[in-house]
Amino acid sequence: MNFVEELRWRGMIADMMPGTEEQLQKELTSAYVGIDPTADSLHIGHLVSVMMLKHFQRAGHRPIALVGGATGMIGDPSMKSAERNLLDEATLRHNQDCIKKQLAKFLDFDSDAPNAAKLVNNYDWMKGYSFLNFIRDIGKHITVNYMMAKDSVKKRLSRESSVGMSFTEFSYQLLQGYDYLYLYEHEGCRLQMGGTDQWGNITTGTELIRRTLGGEAYALTCPLITKADGGKFGKTESGNIWLDRRYTSPYKFYQFWLNVSDADAAKYIKIFTDLSQEEIAALEAEQEAAPHLRPLQKRLAKEVTVMVHSLEDYEAAVEASNILFGNSTHEALLKLDEDTLLAVFEGVPHFDISRDELAAGIKAVDLCTEKAAIFPSKGEMRKLVQSGGVSFNKEKLAEVDTVIDCSSLLDDKYLLVQRGKKNYYLLIAK
């Protein structure tokens, strides 16, 4: 199966310029994807383009990841409604280094093979290019009429937009077009890929190559990923789902994929994993037979978490999930680091308790009625303790008068109380 066929069955092609498939079948081809370096981590919205590059390299072709150091200083107006913050060079260089480390989990940069991946930064060829030379050499080839016809420009200049568009952002498509021309000349790059919102910018590049060099270059875009309910993919109430554990813990990352709908899981497993058609068909059959077991979501969450983080992080995330949603032990709870513990119990009631009072020792029954409103009365707590329905840190509480002190704390700060099977409370010593 060639690259285009692979993307087709995965639902990853929106538009493709005529001649693209023939070019790829003819010879080893270099293709690039542009990556916005405005943060020092990729988020899952970037993953579609990254997976395209991964499939491209697996098909024997040469992937190029272009970090938009120069264009990132401006901001792409495509489908955006406001001007972007501009970044300084030191920040962009730091972001580039972080992004390359993440990309190395998907692409082989170190191989001696002719299709080894390469990372480039357009700031390296734009920083010495004077404005006068640029508008003389490049600007003369693309008319304002051509640039105004792009959907992203029309949208920002429409009456509905109160923001308007600066000359800086208007010039963005010329800069991206020049990137393609530069890579065509210096890296033999014949294909640019991206999301459907990039079609206008990509075709500006193919047009520039045609007009300046008489060369043939191609374009391929993937659909913008949406959710079945029409919501925005990759966003939660707390913001983006990042690939860097500093911003999104492996547990939260795993939970995001585990909780997608059946319809989304069937779509995402083709786009965000390397699983074959046969493997996915088998999972779909399992899902149809026993949807309550959610085999698609579980496999999707496993594959993406292992790919982005590690097998160990995936296993820890599963174990952490079992603490809240299944049967787990005191030992499993002790293994959780503080970030994962807080992520797991983010949605349960929290109570602050005095560290000094706890250090002196407090009876469990007083702690759960007077210091934290877990039980409305001591009598009710006694009744549930007698039937084995109360646990502290996943250990059954045998007596309501058991004295709790600082030695019971997790990470010297937290105490987890469970009332019945499903009610959890997190006490925080302060």
Swiss-Prot record:
Methyltransferase keyword on record: no
Assembly mode: Homodimer.
Binding residue positions for ATP: 235
Gene that encodes it: tyrS
GO MF term (any one): tyrosine-tRNA ligase activity
Keywords attached to this entry: Aminoacyl-tRNA synthetase, ATP-binding, Cytoplasm, Ligase, Nucleotide-binding, Protein biosynthesis, RNA-binding
Family from the record: Belongs to the class-I aminoacyl-tRNA synthetase family. TyrS type 1 subfamily.
EC identifiers of the protein: 6.1.1.1
Main location: cytoplasm
Function field: Catalyzes the attachment of tyrosine to tRNA(Tyr) in a two-step reaction: tyrosine is first activated by ATP to form Tyr-AMP and then transferred to the acceptor end of tRNA(Tyr).
Binding site for L-tyrosine: 32, 172, 176
Cited PANTHER family: TYROSINE--TRNA LIGASE, MITOCHONDRIAL, TYROSYL-TRNA SYNTHETASE
Domain S4 RNA-binding: 362-429
Signal peptide residue numbers: none
InterPro entries in alphabetical order: aa-tRNA-synth_I_CS, aa-tRNA-synth_Ic, Rossmann-like_a/b/a_fold, S4_RNA-bd_sf, SYY-like_C, Tyr-tRNA-ligase, Tyr-tRNA-ligase_bac-type, Tyr-tRNA-ligase_bac_1
Protein known as: Tyrosine--tRNA ligase
Organism of derivation: Parabacteroides distasonis (strain ATCC 8503 / DSM 20701 / CIP 104284 / JCM 5825 / NCTC 11152)
Motif extent ('KMSKS' region): 232-236
Subcellular location: Cytoplasm
GO biological process annotation, one example: tyrosyl-tRNA aminoacylation
Catalytic reaction equation(s): tRNA(Tyr) + L-tyrosine + ATP = L-tyrosyl-tRNA(Tyr) + AMP + diphosphate + H(+)
The organism's place on the tree of life at top rank: Bacteria
Motif 'HIGH' region positions after renumbering to this chain: 37-46
Pfam families noted in UniProt: SYY_C-terminal, tRNA-synt_1b
